[in-house]
A protein has these predicted regions:
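Long insertion/accessory domains within large nucleic-acid-processing enzymes
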Residues: 473-512
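Glycine-centered flexibility sites
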Residues: 296-299, 407, 490, 500
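Alpha-helix N-cap/helix-initiation sites
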Residues: 290-293, 498
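Contiguous, well-ordered alpha-helical segments that form the cores/surfaces of helical PPI scaffolds
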Residues: 293-306, 326, 487
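Conserved catalytic cores of very large enzyme subunits
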Residues: 1-289, 310, 314-473, 477, ...
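Short amphipathic alpha-helical segments with coiled-coil-like heptad repeat character
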Residues: 90-98, 308-312, 491-501, 505-507
Length: 512
Protein backbone atom coordinates (compact mmCIF):
# COMPACT_ATOMS: atom_id res chain seq x y z
CA UNK A 1 0.00 0.00 0.00
CA UNK A 2 1.66 3.18 -1.21
CA UNK A 3 0.29 6.70 -0.98
CA UNK A 4 0.24 9.09 -3.92
CA UNK A 5 0.96 8.54 -7.57
CA UNK A 6 3.51 6.57 -9.54
CA UNK A 7 4.89 7.33 -12.98
CA UNK A 8 6.09 5.08 -15.78
CA UNK A 9 7.80 6.08 -19.01
CA UNK A 10 6.95 4.73 -22.44
CA UNK A 11 10.67 4.93 -23.22
CA UNK A 12 11.06 1.85 -21.03
CA UNK A 13 8.63 -0.10 -23.23
CA UNK A 14 10.00 1.07 -26.58
CA UNK A 15 12.99 -1.36 -26.71
CA UNK A 16 10.57 -4.29 -26.68
CA UNK A 17 9.10 -3.17 -30.00
CA UNK A 18 12.33 -4.34 -31.66
CA UNK A 19 12.13 -7.64 -29.77
CA UNK A 20 8.65 -8.18 -31.24
CA UNK A 21 9.83 -7.05 -34.68
CA UNK A 22 12.57 -9.69 -34.74
CA UNK A 23 10.12 -12.33 -33.53
CA UNK A 24 7.61 -11.51 -36.28
CA UNK A 25 10.27 -11.40 -38.98
CA UNK A 26 11.31 -14.91 -38.03
CA UNK A 27 7.69 -16.11 -37.94
CA UNK A 28 6.83 -14.54 -41.30
CA UNK A 29 9.91 -16.02 -42.95
CA UNK A 30 8.96 -19.48 -41.67
CA UNK A 31 5.32 -19.09 -42.76
CA UNK A 32 6.20 -17.90 -46.27
CA UNK A 33 8.62 -20.79 -46.75
CA UNK A 34 5.92 -23.21 -45.53
CA UNK A 35 3.59 -22.18 -48.37
CA UNK A 36 6.31 -22.11 -51.00
CA UNK A 37 6.75 -18.34 -51.24
CA UNK A 38 10.24 -16.91 -51.45
CA UNK A 39 10.67 -14.79 -48.28
CA UNK A 40 12.24 -11.60 -49.68
CA UNK A 41 13.35 -9.02 -47.13
CA UNK A 42 10.76 -6.54 -48.42
CA UNK A 43 7.88 -8.99 -48.00
CA UNK A 44 9.07 -10.14 -44.59
CA UNK A 45 9.50 -6.61 -43.28
CA UNK A 46 6.14 -5.34 -44.56
CA UNK A 47 4.18 -8.19 -43.00
CA UNK A 48 6.21 -8.03 -39.77
CA UNK A 49 5.53 -4.28 -39.43
CA UNK A 50 1.78 -4.89 -39.75
CA UNK A 51 1.98 -7.38 -36.90
CA UNK A 52 4.16 -5.05 -34.80
CA UNK A 53 1.60 -2.28 -35.20
CA UNK A 54 -1.20 -4.63 -34.15
CA UNK A 55 0.78 -5.67 -31.08
CA UNK A 56 1.42 -2.05 -30.08
CA UNK A 57 -2.32 -1.42 -30.39
CA UNK A 58 -3.20 -4.39 -28.18
CA UNK A 59 -0.46 -3.60 -25.66
CA UNK A 60 -1.45 0.04 -25.17
CA UNK A 61 -5.12 -0.90 -24.92
CA UNK A 62 -4.27 -3.48 -22.27
CA UNK A 63 -2.37 -0.88 -20.21
CA UNK A 64 -5.36 1.49 -20.40
CA UNK A 65 -7.95 -1.09 -19.37
CA UNK A 66 -5.81 -2.74 -16.71
CA UNK A 67 -5.19 0.59 -14.98
CA UNK A 68 -8.86 1.60 -14.88
CA UNK A 69 -10.07 -1.82 -13.72
CA UNK A 70 -7.50 -2.26 -10.93
CA UNK A 71 -8.21 -1.09 -7.39
CA UNK A 72 -5.79 -0.07 -4.67
CA UNK A 73 -6.20 -1.20 -1.07
CA UNK A 74 -8.36 1.85 -0.31
CA UNK A 75 -10.70 1.22 -3.23
CA UNK A 76 -9.32 3.85 -5.60
CA UNK A 77 -8.02 3.45 -9.12
CA UNK A 78 -4.21 3.50 -9.13
CA UNK A 79 -2.84 7.02 -9.56
CA UNK A 80 -0.69 6.18 -12.58
CA UNK A 81 1.03 8.70 -14.84
CA UNK A 82 2.45 7.77 -18.26
CA UNK A 83 5.41 9.89 -19.38
CA UNK A 84 5.96 10.46 -23.11
CA UNK A 85 9.40 11.92 -23.84
CA UNK A 86 11.04 11.30 -27.22
CA UNK A 87 14.50 12.54 -26.26
CA UNK A 88 14.70 9.93 -23.51
CA UNK A 89 15.99 7.48 -26.13
CA UNK A 90 18.64 7.86 -28.87
CA UNK A 91 17.69 8.96 -32.38
CA UNK A 92 17.03 6.23 -34.91
CA UNK A 93 14.84 3.14 -34.84
CA UNK A 94 14.39 3.19 -31.07
CA UNK A 95 13.05 6.76 -31.08
CA UNK A 96 10.76 5.95 -34.01
CA UNK A 97 9.46 2.95 -32.08
CA UNK A 98 8.85 5.15 -29.05
CA UNK A 99 6.98 7.59 -31.31
CA UNK A 100 4.79 4.71 -32.51
CA UNK A 101 3.91 3.75 -28.93
CA UNK A 102 3.18 7.40 -28.03
CA UNK A 103 1.00 7.74 -31.12
CA UNK A 104 -1.03 4.69 -30.14
CA UNK A 105 -1.37 5.90 -26.54
CA UNK A 106 -2.82 9.18 -27.83
CA UNK A 107 -5.14 7.42 -30.30
CA UNK A 108 -6.46 5.16 -27.54
CA UNK A 109 -7.13 8.11 -25.23
CA UNK A 110 -8.88 10.10 -27.96
CA UNK A 111 -11.15 7.08 -28.45
CA UNK A 112 -11.81 6.82 -24.70
CA UNK A 113 -13.15 3.78 -22.86
CA UNK A 114 -16.59 2.24 -23.03
CA UNK A 115 -18.98 2.62 -20.11
CA UNK A 116 -21.85 0.31 -19.21
CA UNK A 117 -24.00 1.82 -21.99
CA UNK A 118 -21.31 1.18 -24.59
CA UNK A 119 -20.51 4.90 -24.90
CA UNK A 120 -16.88 6.01 -25.11
CA UNK A 121 -16.12 8.35 -22.19
CA UNK A 122 -13.09 10.11 -20.69
CA UNK A 123 -11.16 7.92 -18.22
CA UNK A 124 -9.42 9.49 -15.24
CA UNK A 125 -6.31 7.32 -15.51
CA UNK A 126 -3.65 6.89 -16.53
CA UNK A 127 -2.70 10.56 -16.54
CA UNK A 128 -0.60 11.38 -19.61
CA UNK A 129 2.35 13.79 -19.79
CA UNK A 130 3.76 14.82 -23.16
CA UNK A 131 7.13 16.56 -23.32
CA UNK A 132 7.36 19.52 -25.70
CA UNK A 133 10.82 19.56 -27.27
CA UNK A 134 12.75 20.97 -30.22
CA UNK A 135 11.84 18.17 -32.65
CA UNK A 136 8.08 18.23 -32.03
CA UNK A 137 7.06 21.80 -31.16
CA UNK A 138 6.99 23.56 -34.56
CA UNK A 139 5.39 22.70 -37.86
CA UNK A 140 7.98 21.01 -40.05
CA UNK A 141 9.79 19.23 -37.22
CA UNK A 142 9.99 15.44 -37.42
CA UNK A 143 7.47 14.64 -34.70
CA UNK A 144 5.09 17.58 -35.22
CA UNK A 145 2.39 15.04 -36.15
CA UNK A 146 2.51 13.71 -32.58
CA UNK A 147 2.09 17.20 -31.13
CA UNK A 148 -0.96 17.80 -33.35
CA UNK A 149 -2.37 14.49 -32.15
CA UNK A 150 -1.67 15.50 -28.53
CA UNK A 151 -3.57 18.76 -29.11
CA UNK A 152 -6.55 16.81 -30.44
CA UNK A 153 -6.38 14.52 -27.42
CA UNK A 154 -6.24 17.43 -24.97
CA UNK A 155 -9.20 19.13 -26.63
CA UNK A 156 -11.33 16.01 -26.27
CA UNK A 157 -9.99 14.22 -23.16
CA UNK A 158 -8.11 16.92 -21.12
CA UNK A 159 -4.82 15.04 -21.37
CA UNK A 160 -1.94 14.97 -22.00
CA UNK A 161 -0.49 17.65 -19.77
CA UNK A 162 2.68 19.32 -20.98
CA UNK A 163 6.26 19.64 -19.78
CA UNK A 164 8.57 22.06 -21.58
CA UNK A 165 11.93 20.37 -22.00
CA UNK A 166 13.54 23.76 -22.61
CA UNK A 167 12.26 25.38 -19.41
CA UNK A 168 12.70 22.28 -17.26
CA UNK A 169 16.33 21.94 -18.27
CA UNK A 170 16.89 25.56 -17.23
CA UNK A 171 15.36 24.93 -13.81
CA UNK A 172 16.70 21.40 -13.20
CA UNK A 173 20.39 21.71 -14.09
CA UNK A 174 20.01 20.38 -17.62
CA UNK A 175 17.68 17.51 -16.72
CA UNK A 176 14.18 16.68 -17.92
CA UNK A 177 12.21 14.00 -16.10
CA UNK A 178 8.71 13.06 -15.05
CA UNK A 179 6.93 14.05 -11.88
CA UNK A 180 5.71 11.42 -9.40
CA UNK A 181 2.06 11.05 -10.31
CA UNK A 182 0.41 14.45 -10.59
CA UNK A 183 2.93 17.19 -9.72
CA UNK A 184 5.47 16.07 -7.12
CA UNK A 185 8.97 16.51 -8.57
CA UNK A 186 12.18 14.95 -7.35
CA UNK A 187 15.18 17.13 -6.64
CA UNK A 188 18.04 17.07 -9.13
CA UNK A 189 20.03 13.86 -8.63
CA UNK A 190 22.83 14.28 -6.08
CA UNK A 191 23.12 10.65 -4.99
CA UNK A 192 26.66 9.38 -4.51
CA UNK A 193 26.25 5.84 -5.72
CA UNK A 194 23.96 3.03 -6.80
CA UNK A 195 22.20 2.71 -3.41
CA UNK A 196 19.25 0.83 -4.86
CA UNK A 197 21.35 -1.67 -6.85
CA UNK A 198 19.64 -0.65 -10.08
CA UNK A 199 20.69 -2.67 -13.11
CA UNK A 200 20.65 0.37 -15.40
CA UNK A 201 22.27 2.89 -13.05
CA UNK A 202 23.86 5.97 -14.66
CA UNK A 203 25.64 8.39 -12.26
CA UNK A 204 23.93 11.77 -12.05
CA UNK A 205 20.85 10.55 -13.93
CA UNK A 206 18.99 8.63 -11.24
CA UNK A 207 15.28 9.51 -11.31
CA UNK A 208 13.33 6.30 -11.85
CA UNK A 209 13.13 4.34 -8.60
CA UNK A 210 13.36 7.40 -6.38
CA UNK A 211 10.39 8.41 -4.26
CA UNK A 212 8.86 10.85 -1.78
CA UNK A 213 8.64 10.29 1.98
CA UNK A 214 5.50 12.37 2.53
CA UNK A 215 4.07 15.87 2.66
CA UNK A 216 2.79 18.24 5.35
CA UNK A 217 0.87 21.28 4.14
CA UNK A 218 0.98 24.80 5.55
CA UNK A 219 -2.29 26.76 5.35
CA UNK A 220 -1.01 30.24 4.48
CA UNK A 221 -4.48 31.76 4.83
CA UNK A 222 -4.59 30.74 8.48
CA UNK A 223 -1.17 32.28 9.09
CA UNK A 224 -2.32 35.55 7.53
CA UNK A 225 -5.66 35.74 9.36
CA UNK A 226 -3.97 34.88 12.67
CA UNK A 227 -1.66 37.89 12.27
CA UNK A 228 -4.47 40.45 12.20
CA UNK A 229 -2.70 42.18 9.26
CA UNK A 230 0.32 42.94 11.45
CA UNK A 231 3.24 42.26 9.09
CA UNK A 232 5.79 41.61 11.84
CA UNK A 233 3.34 39.23 13.49
CA UNK A 234 2.79 37.48 10.14
CA UNK A 235 6.48 36.64 9.68
CA UNK A 236 6.75 35.55 13.30
CA UNK A 237 3.73 33.25 12.94
CA UNK A 238 5.01 31.92 9.63
CA UNK A 239 8.24 30.82 11.29
CA UNK A 240 6.28 29.19 14.12
CA UNK A 241 4.10 27.27 11.68
CA UNK A 242 7.13 26.27 9.64
CA UNK A 243 8.66 24.79 12.77
CA UNK A 244 5.44 22.85 13.35
CA UNK A 245 5.55 21.52 9.78
CA UNK A 246 9.21 20.63 10.20
CA UNK A 247 8.50 18.57 13.32
CA UNK A 248 5.62 16.81 11.56
CA UNK A 249 7.83 15.98 8.57
CA UNK A 250 10.54 14.59 10.83
CA UNK A 251 7.90 12.34 12.41
CA UNK A 252 7.01 11.06 8.92
CA UNK A 253 10.69 10.47 8.20
CA UNK A 254 11.31 8.64 11.48
CA UNK A 255 8.25 6.49 10.87
CA UNK A 256 9.98 5.12 7.78
CA UNK A 257 13.35 4.51 9.44
CA UNK A 258 13.94 0.84 10.13
CA UNK A 259 11.36 -0.34 7.59
CA UNK A 260 12.53 -3.71 6.23
CA UNK A 261 12.43 -4.31 2.49
CA UNK A 262 10.24 -7.35 3.18
CA UNK A 263 7.14 -5.18 3.82
CA UNK A 264 6.74 -4.67 0.05
CA UNK A 265 9.06 -6.94 -1.95
CA UNK A 266 7.86 -5.69 -5.33
CA UNK A 267 8.88 -2.16 -4.34
CA UNK A 268 12.04 -2.67 -2.35
CA UNK A 269 13.46 -6.03 -3.51
CA UNK A 270 12.25 -6.64 -7.06
CA UNK A 271 13.18 -3.35 -8.66
CA UNK A 272 10.09 -1.12 -8.64
CA UNK A 273 11.98 1.25 -6.34
CA UNK A 274 15.06 -0.73 -5.35
CA UNK A 275 16.77 -4.12 -5.29
CA UNK A 276 17.57 -4.45 -1.60
CA UNK A 277 18.33 -7.73 0.15
CA UNK A 278 15.74 -9.56 2.21
CA UNK A 279 15.70 -8.14 5.72
CA UNK A 280 17.65 -5.05 4.68
CA UNK A 281 16.12 -1.75 5.81
CA UNK A 282 15.29 1.09 3.43
CA UNK A 283 17.18 3.63 5.60
CA UNK A 284 19.93 4.46 3.09
CA UNK A 285 17.26 5.45 0.56
CA UNK A 286 15.95 8.17 2.90
CA UNK A 287 19.14 10.26 2.79
CA UNK A 288 21.66 11.77 0.35
CA UNK A 289 18.94 13.02 -1.98
CA UNK A 290 17.70 9.58 -3.02
CA UNK A 291 14.18 10.44 -1.84
CA UNK A 292 12.47 13.75 -1.12
CA UNK A 293 10.14 14.97 1.62
CA UNK A 294 7.75 17.84 0.95
CA UNK A 295 6.69 21.04 2.63
CA UNK A 296 3.34 21.78 1.04
CA UNK A 297 1.61 25.14 0.94
CA UNK A 298 -1.83 26.39 -0.07
CA UNK A 299 -3.78 29.63 -0.26
CA UNK A 300 -1.04 32.04 -1.32
CA UNK A 301 -3.68 34.03 -3.19
CA UNK A 302 -5.97 34.57 -0.16
CA UNK A 303 -2.98 35.10 2.13
CA UNK A 304 -1.85 37.98 -0.08
CA UNK A 305 -5.35 39.44 -0.34
CA UNK A 306 -5.63 39.56 3.44
CA UNK A 307 -2.18 40.99 4.14
CA UNK A 308 -1.97 43.44 1.23
CA UNK A 309 -5.59 44.04 0.27
CA UNK A 310 -4.88 43.17 -3.37
CA UNK A 311 -4.52 40.08 -5.53
CA UNK A 312 -1.07 38.59 -5.85
CA UNK A 313 -1.31 39.45 -9.56
CA UNK A 314 -0.98 43.15 -8.60
CA UNK A 315 2.65 44.37 -8.31
CA UNK A 316 2.42 45.01 -4.55
CA UNK A 317 0.83 41.61 -4.01
CA UNK A 318 3.32 39.84 -6.27
CA UNK A 319 6.27 41.22 -4.33
CA UNK A 320 4.82 39.98 -1.04
CA UNK A 321 3.81 36.57 -2.44
CA UNK A 322 7.28 35.97 -3.87
CA UNK A 323 8.82 36.93 -0.54
CA UNK A 324 6.64 34.30 1.19
CA UNK A 325 7.73 31.68 -1.35
CA UNK A 326 11.39 32.51 -0.80
CA UNK A 327 11.00 32.14 2.96
CA UNK A 328 9.43 28.71 2.50
CA UNK A 329 12.32 27.68 0.25
CA UNK A 330 14.86 29.01 2.75
CA UNK A 331 13.29 26.81 5.43
CA UNK A 332 13.59 23.73 3.20
CA UNK A 333 17.25 24.56 2.53
CA UNK A 334 17.97 24.92 6.26
CA UNK A 335 16.36 21.55 7.06
CA UNK A 336 18.11 19.84 4.14
CA UNK A 337 21.54 21.01 5.32
CA UNK A 338 20.78 19.94 8.88
CA UNK A 339 19.63 16.38 8.11
CA UNK A 340 21.00 15.51 4.63
CA UNK A 341 17.40 14.86 3.59
CA UNK A 342 16.00 16.55 0.48
CA UNK A 343 13.24 18.77 1.86
CA UNK A 344 11.49 20.46 -1.04
CA UNK A 345 8.67 23.00 -1.49
CA UNK A 346 5.49 21.53 -2.97
CA UNK A 347 2.37 23.28 -4.28
CA UNK A 348 -0.32 21.22 -2.56
CA UNK A 349 -3.31 20.42 -4.82
CA UNK A 350 -5.84 20.18 -1.93
CA UNK A 351 -8.12 17.89 -3.95
CA UNK A 352 -10.67 17.56 -1.13
CA UNK A 353 -8.88 19.19 1.83
CA UNK A 354 -9.72 22.58 0.33
CA UNK A 355 -13.24 22.29 1.81
CA UNK A 356 -11.96 21.27 5.24
CA UNK A 357 -9.45 24.14 5.32
CA UNK A 358 -12.10 26.65 4.21
CA UNK A 359 -14.62 25.52 6.84
CA UNK A 360 -11.98 25.67 9.59
CA UNK A 361 -11.05 29.21 8.51
CA UNK A 362 -14.69 30.31 8.54
CA UNK A 363 -15.23 28.83 11.98
CA UNK A 364 -12.12 30.49 13.37
CA UNK A 365 -12.17 33.89 11.67
CA UNK A 366 -15.68 34.30 10.29
CA UNK A 367 -16.46 35.42 6.76
CA UNK A 368 -13.83 37.81 5.40
CA UNK A 369 -14.61 39.12 1.92
CA UNK A 370 -12.18 37.83 -0.68
CA UNK A 371 -10.42 35.65 1.88
CA UNK A 372 -12.70 33.21 3.72
CA UNK A 373 -16.00 33.80 1.88
CA UNK A 374 -15.68 30.68 -0.29
CA UNK A 375 -15.98 27.01 0.63
CA UNK A 376 -12.54 26.45 -0.85
CA UNK A 377 -9.10 28.03 -0.78
CA UNK A 378 -6.87 28.39 -3.79
CA UNK A 379 -4.53 25.62 -4.86
CA UNK A 380 -0.84 26.45 -4.16
CA UNK A 381 0.24 29.72 -5.89
CA UNK A 382 -2.56 29.78 -8.46
CA UNK A 383 -4.44 32.86 -9.59
CA UNK A 384 -7.91 32.80 -8.00
CA UNK A 385 -10.35 30.85 -10.15
CA UNK A 386 -12.73 33.84 -10.38
CA UNK A 387 -10.08 36.34 -11.51
CA UNK A 388 -10.29 37.48 -15.13
CA UNK A 389 -6.93 36.89 -16.82
CA UNK A 390 -5.90 35.60 -20.26
CA UNK A 391 -4.40 32.15 -20.71
CA UNK A 392 -1.04 33.58 -21.78
CA UNK A 393 -0.88 36.17 -18.98
CA UNK A 394 -1.79 33.51 -16.41
CA UNK A 395 0.91 31.11 -17.57
CA UNK A 396 3.53 33.85 -17.70
CA UNK A 397 2.59 35.18 -14.26
CA UNK A 398 2.53 31.76 -12.59
CA UNK A 399 5.84 30.67 -14.14
CA UNK A 400 7.78 32.76 -11.59
CA UNK A 401 6.05 30.92 -8.74
CA UNK A 402 6.53 27.54 -10.37
CA UNK A 403 10.27 28.21 -10.37
CA UNK A 404 10.06 28.71 -6.58
CA UNK A 405 8.09 25.48 -6.08
CA UNK A 406 10.75 22.90 -7.01
CA UNK A 407 9.15 20.03 -5.11
CA UNK A 408 6.06 20.15 -7.27
CA UNK A 409 3.77 22.52 -9.12
CA UNK A 410 1.46 22.63 -12.12
CA UNK A 411 -0.37 25.52 -13.76
CA UNK A 412 -3.54 25.33 -15.83
CA UNK A 413 -5.73 27.38 -18.12
CA UNK A 414 -9.49 26.94 -18.30
CA UNK A 415 -10.78 26.71 -21.86
CA UNK A 416 -14.12 26.09 -23.61
CA UNK A 417 -14.70 23.23 -26.06
CA UNK A 418 -11.63 23.43 -28.32
CA UNK A 419 -12.23 20.41 -30.56
CA UNK A 420 -12.93 22.71 -33.53
CA UNK A 421 -10.08 25.10 -32.74
CA UNK A 422 -6.95 22.97 -32.49
CA UNK A 423 -4.80 25.84 -33.78
CA UNK A 424 -5.56 27.71 -30.53
CA UNK A 425 -4.66 24.62 -28.49
CA UNK A 426 -1.36 24.36 -30.36
CA UNK A 427 -0.69 28.06 -29.77
CA UNK A 428 -1.10 27.55 -26.01
CA UNK A 429 1.17 24.50 -26.15
CA UNK A 430 3.86 26.48 -27.96
CA UNK A 431 3.54 29.24 -25.37
CA UNK A 432 4.00 26.65 -22.62
CA UNK A 433 7.17 25.43 -24.34
CA UNK A 434 8.67 28.92 -24.34
CA UNK A 435 7.49 30.17 -20.94
CA UNK A 436 6.62 27.62 -18.24
CA UNK A 437 7.84 24.20 -17.14
CA UNK A 438 4.60 22.30 -16.56
CA UNK A 439 1.02 23.16 -17.49
CA UNK A 440 -2.32 21.76 -18.61
CA UNK A 441 -5.54 22.79 -20.32
CA UNK A 442 -8.90 22.21 -18.62
CA UNK A 443 -12.01 21.59 -20.67
CA UNK A 444 -15.25 19.67 -20.09
CA UNK A 445 -16.01 16.09 -21.08
CA UNK A 446 -19.42 14.89 -19.84
CA UNK A 447 -22.15 12.45 -20.85
CA UNK A 448 -25.74 11.99 -19.65
CA UNK A 449 -26.87 8.37 -19.60
CA UNK A 450 -30.54 9.37 -19.42
CA UNK A 451 -30.80 11.28 -22.71
CA UNK A 452 -27.44 10.72 -24.41
CA UNK A 453 -26.40 14.37 -24.14
CA UNK A 454 -22.67 14.92 -24.68
CA UNK A 455 -21.30 18.28 -23.60
CA UNK A 456 -21.02 20.23 -20.36
CA UNK A 457 -23.19 19.05 -17.47
CA UNK A 458 -23.93 22.11 -15.33
CA UNK A 459 -23.64 22.76 -11.59
CA UNK A 460 -26.83 24.25 -10.10
CA UNK A 461 -28.32 24.86 -6.66
CA UNK A 462 -31.10 22.56 -5.48
CA UNK A 463 -34.03 23.76 -3.34
CA UNK A 464 -31.88 23.50 -0.19
CA UNK A 465 -29.01 25.50 -1.69
CA UNK A 466 -26.80 22.45 -2.19
CA UNK A 467 -24.71 22.33 -5.36
CA UNK A 468 -25.77 19.48 -7.65
CA UNK A 469 -24.97 18.38 -11.19
CA UNK A 470 -27.74 18.71 -13.79
CA UNK A 471 -27.97 17.75 -17.45
CA UNK A 472 -28.95 20.91 -19.38
CA UNK A 473 -30.82 18.80 -21.92
CA UNK A 474 -33.10 16.58 -19.80
CA UNK A 475 -32.66 17.87 -16.24
CA UNK A 476 -31.19 14.58 -14.94
CA UNK A 477 -29.58 15.05 -11.51
CA UNK A 478 -28.80 11.41 -10.74
CA UNK A 479 -25.01 11.19 -10.45
CA UNK A 480 -25.21 7.45 -11.07
CA UNK A 481 -26.67 8.18 -14.49
CA UNK A 482 -24.10 10.64 -15.75
CA UNK A 483 -20.39 10.68 -16.51
CA UNK A 484 -18.67 13.91 -15.49
CA UNK A 485 -14.93 14.47 -15.96
CA UNK A 486 -13.30 17.59 -14.56
CA UNK A 487 -9.77 18.54 -13.69
CA UNK A 488 -9.69 18.40 -9.90
CA UNK A 489 -6.22 19.91 -9.51
CA UNK A 490 -3.76 17.89 -11.55
CA UNK A 491 -5.61 14.63 -11.99
CA UNK A 492 -8.93 14.27 -13.76
CA UNK A 493 -11.76 13.47 -11.36
CA UNK A 494 -14.74 11.36 -12.39
CA UNK A 495 -16.26 10.43 -9.01
CA UNK A 496 -17.73 13.83 -8.09
CA UNK A 497 -16.49 16.12 -5.34
CA UNK A 498 -17.37 17.65 -1.99
CA UNK A 499 -19.27 20.95 -1.83
CA UNK A 500 -16.12 23.06 -1.53
CA UNK A 501 -14.39 21.64 -4.59
CA UNK A 502 -17.69 21.66 -6.51
CA UNK A 503 -18.09 25.39 -5.80
CA UNK A 504 -14.52 25.99 -6.98
CA UNK A 505 -15.20 24.10 -10.23
CA UNK A 506 -18.45 26.05 -10.77
CA UNK A 507 -16.74 29.43 -10.34
CA UNK A 508 -13.81 28.86 -12.69
CA UNK A 509 -13.66 31.56 -15.37
CA UNK A 510 -12.43 30.86 -18.89
CA UNK A 511 -8.96 32.06 -19.81
CA UNK A 512 -9.30 31.61 -23.57
Amino acid sequence: SQYGGQSISLSHLAPFVQVSREKYRKQVRTELEAIGVTPTEDKVNKIAEIRVKEEINRGVQMIQYQVITLMTTNGQAPFITVFMYLDEVPEGQLRDDLAAVIEEMLHQRILGVKNEQGVYITPAFPKLIYVLEADNIREGTKYWYLTKLAAECTAKRMVPDYISEKIMKKLKDGNCYTCMGCRSFLTVDRTKGNYANAKNYVPGKKYYGRFNQGVVTLNLVDVACSSGKDMDKFWELLDERLDLCYRALIIRHKRLLGTPSDVAPILWQNGALARLKKGETIDKLLYDGYSTISLGYAGLCECTRYMKGVSHTEPEGTEFALKVMRRLNDACTEWKEKHNIDFSLYGTPLESTTYKFAKCLQKRFGIISGVTDKNYITNSYHVHVTEEISAFDKLKFESQFQELSPGGAISYVEVPNMQNNLDAVLAVMQYIYDNIMYAELNTKSDYCMECGYSGEIKIVNDKDGKLVWECPNCGNRDQNKMSVARRTCGYIGTQFWNQGRTQEIKERVLHL
